[in-house]
Curated annotation (Swiss-Prot):
Disulfide bonds: none annotated. CDD domains: F-box_AtSKIP3-like (cd22162). GO terms for molecular function: carbohydrate binding. The gene is PP2B13. This is F-box protein PP2-B13. It comes from Arabidopsis thaliana (Mouse-ear cress). Residues 1-44 form the F-box domain.
Amino acid sequence: MMMLPEACVANILAFTSPADAFSSSEVSSVFRLAGDSDFVWEKFLPSHYKSLISQSTDHHRIFSSKKEIYRCLCDSLLIDNARKLFKINKFSGKISYILSARDISITYSDHASYCSWSNVSDSRFSESAELITTDRLEIKGKIQTTVLSPNTKYGAYLIMKVTNGAYGLDLVPAETSVKSKNGQNNKNTTYLCCLDEKKQQMKRLFYGNREERMAMTVEAVGGDGKRREPKARDDGWLEIELGEFVTREGEDDEVNMSLTEVKGYQLKGGIVIDGIEVRPIPLK
């Protein structure tokens, strides 16, 4: 292998993985040169990478190599008038998207008395939506499987925060759904905030079993009896899992993702919504 010509090594690396190509530079100078070649990194780039760059907020940037383009996509790219964020995993090349709050549908988001838009310091986007008050919550997004990695299991996650003045989020569970036009259907229920035992005790003291009665308005779909609620992310936000789906090679499918709470007629507010992330689920 050490005596193979550079072109031959490059051809071999193109049939491996981005992780192998990155580590090849440690083998020898021939492997380092082959591992930097445009031929290799063209194989690992998404087929629509030129379109992605042309849609990006940094579309005038000049790249010196295909490997530099790959690294740029690993760092993430704002596209579609900065309404979406595109990213690939450095070592697997798998594609992820975040649809901003402006790129999804949120109940009453165009009514200032129900929802306010502002720049949140640690958001990826210029605006996030804060739910002020409503008795109906519907958040919906969609994505085409053709822009994702084929033959991959994906998860969809609502990225959000709960403000200090939040209210009405823990009485009725919301319903989550991920549905595709080709028949995939994944449903569940989740609460919009984490359990606070002290608050729960106070509510039971003042309201008795009102919470249990209201929760019964939502059909239990999980089946395992677990209380689902937001989980902390590494970036300081919270996320709620909406569901899972699988992409197939050569299949053009539309995936619809949603979180709704419309049955309890419970006033609620204090959620900041950054968007919906669609990312590959790591193999166990």
